[in-house]
């Protein structure tokens, strides 16, 4: 029995190692042509279904990127364009794209020493949402790699994302995540804007890296 258990553990470790090695950043770079029209333009603003700057994803964790794309594909995140794109991707495509975007800012650690302290009102709201317990004290080091880095992300995107967790019965806007829905719903829109405005000012590892469609 002990030998069987040891074998199963070894096989599981091998499988996890293989999955990690299966992410190919070079392949992801070639597959990113469909992404750079929005995510490769600094400050690019979406106009449908809502108006906001598309998120910076260079430097975001690969497991989070995979999680987000999977949620779009399943319909847990509602966005017509992103769902269509995610539906066209295989699991391998997602892994490769995530690896490419994660490594684009490797070595560019956020300088947390320059982070401004939140105002008393914002500090109270962050405490109310218990935000740091998952996203990390500096909001750049989430406790789980499938959670996003928030520091320095565009305020209007963060606001739209949090507002989406409050949205029900809308075929084009909304996010289905029980934990985040429970956290976001007690906040007013004004409170969400205070929180996201502060998060956007923090030192960040996230960037938009301009890229050409022609490679």
Predicted regions mapped to residue ranges:
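Sequence/structural segment immediately N-terminal to covalent heme-attachment motifs in c-type
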Residues: 23-45, 114-139, 154, 211-212
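Bacterial N-terminal signal peptides that target proteins for export
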Residues: 1-8
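Extracytoplasmic c-type cytochrome modules immediately beyond a signal peptide or single-pass transmembrane anchor
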Residues: 51, 62-116
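Gly/Gly-Pro-rich "capping" loops immediately C-terminal to redox-active cysteine motifs
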Residues: 43-72, 83-88, 124, 132, ...
């Amino acid at each position: 029995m002990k030998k069987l258990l040891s074998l199963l553990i070894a096989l599981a470790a091998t499988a996890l190692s293989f999955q990690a090695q299966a992410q190919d950043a070079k392949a992801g770079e070639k597959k990113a042509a469909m992404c750079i029209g929005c995510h490769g333009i600094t400050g690019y603003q979406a106009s449908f279904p809502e108006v906001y700057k598309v998120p910076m994803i260079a430097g975001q964790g690969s497991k989070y990127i995979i999680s987000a794309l999977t949620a779009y594909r399943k319909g847990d995140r509602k966005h017509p364009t992103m769902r269509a794109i995610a539906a066209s991707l295989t699991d391998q495509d997602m892994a490769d794209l995530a690896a490419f975007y994660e490594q684009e800012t490797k070595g560019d650690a956020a300088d947390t020493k320059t982070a401004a302290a939140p105002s008393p009102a914002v500090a109270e709201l962050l405490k109310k949402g218990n935000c740091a317990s998952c996203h990390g004290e500096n909001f750049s080091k989430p406790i789980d790699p499938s959670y996003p880095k928030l520091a320095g992300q565009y305020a209007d995107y963060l606001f739209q994302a949090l507002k989406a967790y409050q949205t029900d019965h809308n075929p084009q806007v909304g996010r289905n995540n029980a934990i985040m829905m429970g956290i976001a719903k007690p906040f007013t829109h004004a409170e969400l804007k205070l929180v996201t405005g502060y998060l956007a000012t923090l030192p960040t590892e996230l960037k938009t890296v301009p890229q050409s469609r022609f490679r």
